[in-house]
Amino acid sequence: MMRILLFVATNLAVVLVASITLSLFGFNGFMAANGVDLNLSSLLVFCAVFGFAGSLVSLFISKWMAKMSTGTQIISQPRTRHEQWLLQTVEELSREAGIKMPEVGIFPAYEANAFATGWNRNDALVAVSQGLLERFSPDEVRAVLAHEIGHVANGDMVTLALVQGVVNTFVMFFARIIGNFVDKVIFKNEEGQGIAYYVATIVAELILGILASMIVMWFSRRREYRADEAGAQLAGTSAMIGALQRLRVEQGLPVHMPDTMKAFGINGGLKHGLAGLLMSHPPLEDRIEALRRRG
């Protein structure tokens, strides 16, 4: 609950600071002088409500969406010794991390992957792929589970929802300012909002959305390093490195994880350079090297 309260407080603070900053720099006067009659404070609040609403809804239904999109089967009563071991391992790691036991599931995929999601660190879901269970050693699976428990314990789902809400707000806000500026100043439209407003707003949202995604993915990559550190603390550095090395060997296999879930999986990060700016995970070799430096 404290994380949700922090979420709301941070959102309000962002809107307040942005509104004050725009006023101090005379942005309202600049827009009015150029024929754009906008109440920027009201527009900012409007964009914040819709921007954060989307990320909040996604956060609260994340477990349901994950189960539906991946076909995850929750283990309520273990039927095999592998399922029994999986439940016991997650319970042990959760206790060490100081969180409540999450739901545990298996999703039908050949690639080795796992994910954690949920709106609350004490109401989460941790799932692993069938391929990971079949091909990884118990120590490697335990390290992967420790990484996912690290995500839950660090509150990464709430953090990324917060970041996404902030960037959603400013993408909507500045796209509409650009749309109004193009419509009123460049095309001199004085009768409501013309076609130029809608075209410019859509184009601006696309461009700003790409830039915003880079910010969100940067935060996501930082959280992966932290989850690796948590995994190393819970399962041992050598086991965590071994699991990442094994994932690197399997990177050529096709990935069937839905795009909406890739940011919460353990496997990813194949691209470097500009393409790497839009990746949710750092390259595996970088993650392995970071753990080696950590010792």
Curated annotation (Swiss-Prot):
The active site is at E148. Zn(2+) binds at H147, H151, E224. Binds 1 zinc ion per subunit. Gene3D superfamilies: Metalloproteases ('zincins'), catalytic domain (3.30.2010.10). InterPro entries: HtpX_protease, Pept_M48_protease_HtpX, Peptidase_M48. GO terms for cellular component: plasma membrane. Its EC number is 3.4.24.-. It is a multi-pass membrane protein. It comes from the Bacteria. GO terms for molecular function: metalloendopeptidase activity; zinc ion binding. The chain crosses the membrane at residues 4-24, 41-61, 158-178, 199-219. It is found in: Cell inner membrane. Its main location: membrane. Keywords: Cell inner membrane, Cell membrane, Hydrolase, Membrane, Metal-binding, Metalloprotease, Protease, Transmembrane, Transmembrane helix, Zinc. Its cofactor is Zn(2+). It holds the Pfam family Peptidase_M48. GO terms for biological process: proteolysis. PANTHER family: PROTEASE HTPX. Belongs to the peptidase M48B family. This is Protease HtpX. The gene is htpX.
